[in-house]
């Protein structure tokens, strides 16, 4: 999996 994409998804969930 793409770590950058995963981190982006995490950011979207927290924002």
Swiss-Prot record:
Record's keyword terms, sorted: Glycoprotein, Hemagglutinin, Lectin
Keyword Glycoprotein: yes
GO MF term list: carbohydrate binding
Glycoprotein is among the record's keywords: yes
Induction record: Hemagglutinating activity is inhibited by polygalacturonic acid.
Glycosylation site list: 2
Similarity comment text for this entry: Belongs to the leguminous lectin family.
Complexes and interactors: Heterodimer of a 29 kDa and a 31 kDa subunit.
Record function comment: Trypsin-stable lectin with hemagglutinating activity. Has mitogenic activity on murine splenocytes. Inhibits HIV-reverse transcriptase.
Name of the protein in its database record: Lectin 31 kDa subunit
